[in-house]
């Protein structure tokens, strides 16, 4: 069955490793999350000296059926909620 992708960009404190963010994404992504790829790390003084932006590509897929957009969107919502709670991220 076809996969669907979502990209998320997160503004986060420089002290938080990208690996820790990815661990949360994997733990909160649900059964349909099949891959996570960090594709950009951006630092700029406009973000603040203690901030960076991390961009991830998330792939969702079911082995039993085609996912609808709402299912993938709900997974992303759960991920963002947990990242905000745990790391005080801001979605970009």
State the predicted function of each range.
Residues 1-92:
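A carboxyl-terminal module marker
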